[in-house]
């Protein structure tokens, strides 16, 4: 999602960003707030959103922000919107939200104003939530500003609070045998910051799920698993496809459009069990 820029912001900007993160963090809700979140089959959930920012190759300024909404549980795209943007803030680890969230927020607000009936009931975000240097990643930031339930879905482990991608961590990953198996990410502080989830039988690389806003970790993990036709949950995957295709068309680049996922590859029914270490969730 992020592309590192050559220069960093001045120290006063970083201090301002830290204060803003601390202010917004006070509004994070890390529990279920909707009835559908507590239902084993997510009854009542009809629309799941995904967001992504893709970059023009070799360009740290030009990018494409994308929002898609999928029907649930069918996982068919019912809304998509992409726009080319010019990024003004540099990439700094731990401050991704200040670079990307303003554009994603605009897309959500546009949908809310123009087609409120298609508003997602939850957003899956390519990035971290409370699994973050200061406990306030991009999924928290977007969740608080939109007041939507948000889930952080990261492809790599953010090594904070003593979490390390060491031999012990790799052994825990090896023990994730089937789709839905997971284990908690317990920091040195004693806090469970997220879960490592095997999201697909054909991928041994886990996803790192964390709370963004207005959703419990248990529900976030179950929902992510229910949204996976492949390793990456479909809302995030389709947002990535949409943004890359928009870049291709906007720049007149050659190549056929990226195919949508086939309907035949739908996830199995949502789980009814509880999450826990190495427990099958779907």
Curated annotation (Swiss-Prot):
UniProt effect for mutating residue 227 to S: 68% decrease in activity
Molecular function, one GO term: RNA endonuclease activity, producing 5'-phosphomonoesters
EC number: 3.1.26.-
Keyword entries, A-Z: Cytoplasm, DNA-binding, Endonuclease, Hydrolase, Magnesium, Metal-binding, Nuclease, Nucleus, RNA-binding
Outcome of swapping residue 174 to A: No effect on subcellular location or activity
Oligomeric form and interacting partners: Monomer. Interacts with PABPC1; the interaction is RNA-dependent and stimulates ENDOV activity.
Name of the featured protein: Endonuclease V
